[in-house]
Amino acid sequence: QFGATHAAPADVNGDGKIDILATRGHGVGVMWFEAPNWKQHMIDDTIDSTHSTDFGDIDGDGDIDMSTVGYESKLAVWYENDGRGHFTRHVLSRDQMAYDTMITDLDGDGHMDILVAGQRSQNVVWFENPQK
């Protein structure tokens, strides 16, 4: 089992405690660790080489969602949180050999978009949030 290459603090399950979201850049999986005992919860055990993650309220429901990219999987994805730490995967692209992702309101419309930097795909891609 490979260790995490990226970690980010966030209240994942809405209990007021800061948990840790983590990715395995040299292995498979995206997970979160629940405070205060740091119990591991697997979010996705199929995505490969997830070098970065970001979190924010992508779907506008008030909880923490996350985005990541799987370099070897060629995936750009975001995970919808139900507010209790259970996640549903949404695939944005199946052709992104990327290392970095960022959640930001790129167009200023009040909805969080996802930005992906593709190293081998040699691109920067903006995935606009479809909420209006």
Question: Where do the model's predicted regions map?
Answer:
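Surface loop/turn motifs at the tips and blade-to-blade linkers of beta-strand repeat domains
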Residues: 1-2, 43-48, 91-96
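Beta-propeller blade termini
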Residues: 5-14, 51-58, 99-108
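Hydrophobic beta-strand segments that make up the repeating blades of beta-propeller
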Residues: 20-23, 66-69, 114-117
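Beta-propeller blade repeat segments, especially FG-GAP/WD-type strand-to-loop junctions
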Residues: 28-41, 75-88, 123-132
